[in-house]
């Protein structure tokens, strides 16, 4: 850490460990953004709860082996959830988000404090990518082709 700091700022000459921690700008705080991510985290709690049921039943070992289907009854919340990659947020191989005009299916996992959200969790299908470990490769991929399209782009 010290060497990196002195290489980046050679004119400083002081130890990085003696510097004051800079304060955040007051205008950086955005309550709307905080509210937006609070809603995403609440939906994520429902998804991880549904995944945990499969894990306890020994159906899956890792969240990457799950393919949740999220049912959302609130249009505003649905739009917020569709604006982010929920498979990345929930650490799953894939995820489906459905807007439900009627009630949420009875077989869904729900949490009392997160209304209008239900999750059905299934096991992900496919072959495991050797780089990111997601199960999204077609099962009939030829031998030696062990990277998903996203990882192929990253290593090129």
Q: What does each model-found stretch correspond to?
A:
Residues 1-50, 54-74, 78-81, 96-99, ...:
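Acidic, turn-prone loop/beta-hairpin segments
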Residues 84-98:
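Conserved C-terminal helical docking segment of ANL/AMP-forming enzymes
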Residues 124-127, 143:
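Flanking scaffold residues of small Cys/His-coordinated metal-binding clusters
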Residues 134-140, 156:
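Short functional micro-motifs and their immediate structural scaffolds
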Residues 141-149:
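Short cysteine/histidine-rich zinc-coordinating motifs and their immediately flanking basic loops
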